[in-house]
Amino acid sequence: MIQVLLVTICLAAFPYQGSSIILESGNVNDYEIVYPRKVTPVPRGAVQPKYEDAMQYELKVNGEPVVLHLEKNKGLFSEDYSETHYSPDGREITTYPLVEDHCYYHGRIENDADSTASISTCNGLKGHFKLQGEMYLIEPLELSDSEAHAVYKYENVEKEDEAPKMCGVTQNWESYEPTKKAFQLNLTPEQQGFPQRYVELVIIADHRMYMKYKRDSNKITQWVHQMVNTINEIYRPLNIQFALVGLEIWSNQDLITVTSVSDDTLISFANWRETVLLRRKSHDNAQLLTAIVFDEGIIGRAPLAGMCDPNRSVGTVQDHSKINFRVAIIMAHEIGHNLGMGHDDNSCTCGGYSCIMLPRLSKQPSKLFSDCSKKDYLTFLKVKNPQCILNKPLRTDTVSTPVSGNELLEA
């Protein structure tokens, strides 16, 4: 039986109108201070895990009480999840950390059917939730009062860069559009049922990422875990579960040539993934997370309909924002291209301010797929019938032993 924890957040809700605070997400105006307080622990004598399977939080937002229900995202990691980094002399070091009792949750707001939440509880509450159609961020404050958190609307974060940010979808690797048009589905609402699919994901953080985060692999790891948790939340309506099977940090040097020309970097990464990564770690899709600034305002690139192809089931994503879910949205967008989704045009709708497959990142990023994207995805399943995303992640997915010189550490 799942023990449910009730935590009351006593809100000395102090909105600082017109003043600014510097948070991890950037400069924020108009925020509230909240103080979490645990009031209903698990029954006396019960074994309490570090992170409960289900939790509830009470808090006030804009002066109104809300209840946040959270459930652990148990499918976030595969059973053989591994982390790889490199020693100063270039040796590959792979560990298999125990991640069953992790701290990443999905959730909803009570009495708000349209609400969503993606929260980590690793060090306080950190993440985002949607309430009454608006996106809010929450994060702990670095104050002497360790329980203080800030809650604020996404729109109140000062924008880091007003320059347009675009996706550079790659279509010239294989002509998919003619086949797609021949099989284009005209779906009634009743037909838009999505079959269960599973994507085993590997994320590579390049050397610039390692330097950007001041050589702190733990920070990169938490950043990536939070991103994949959000990607899972985004794809839940399409019935796709993402399991992170591996995280690799190029801590010594890049293993490919990473340049500001996004197409060159994508091709180089795709070739490395096919010839090196696939031989030592079975997976369905690999994404390169880089701190380089790509030319022409591009922040992501991926081949169209490449999922399950050894050379095309890849993407590159620029770590362009201090706000985790903005980067997660770009990675979800690029994976959408891998799953057959083209860019939305003006005829596409999703019931939101913007849709996730727009060619440019909007000022109010959306986590919603349009009707066009859903049709594209179902058409991709029908035309390509990708086999690699049929199986659930298993512990036996490691297909070969590491080459001589690697260190294998069981944590």
Curated annotation (Swiss-Prot):
Cofactor note: Binds 1 zinc ion per subunit.
GO annotations of cellular component type: extracellular region; plasma membrane
Protein's job: This venom zinc protease has fibrinolytic activity. The recombinant enzyme cleaves both alpha- (FGA) and beta-chains (FGB) of fibrinogen, but not the gamma-chain. The recombinant protein does not produce hemorrhage in mice and does not have effect on ADP- or collagen-stimulated platelet aggregation.
Keyword Transmembrane helix: no
Organism: Agkistrodon piscivorus leucostoma (Western cottonmouth)
Endpoints of the signal sequence: 1-20
Protein name: Snake venom metalloproteinase VMP1
Tissue: Expressed by the venom gland.
Family per record: Belongs to the venom metalloproteinase (M12B) family. P-I subfamily.
Binding annotation for Zn(2+): H333, H337, H343
GO biological process: proteolysis
UniProt xrefs under PANTHER family: ADAM A DISINTEGRIN AND METALLOPROTEASE DOMAIN, DISINTEGRIN AND METALLOPROTEINASE DOMAIN-CONTAINING PROTEIN 28
Keywords: Calcium, Disulfide bond, Fibrinogenolytic toxin, Fibrinolytic toxin, Glycoprotein, Hemostasis impairing toxin, Hydrolase, Metal-binding, Metalloprotease, Protease, Secreted, Signal, Toxin, Zinc, Zymogen
Glycosylation sites: N311
Enzyme class: hydrolase
Binding site for Ca(2+) 2: V403, N406, L408, E410
Disulfide bond keyword on record: yes
Named cofactor requirement(s): Zn(2+)
Annotated propeptide span(s): 21-189
Subcellular location: Secreted
Complex and partners: Monomer.
Residue ranges of every copy of the Peptidase M12B domain listed in the record: 197-393
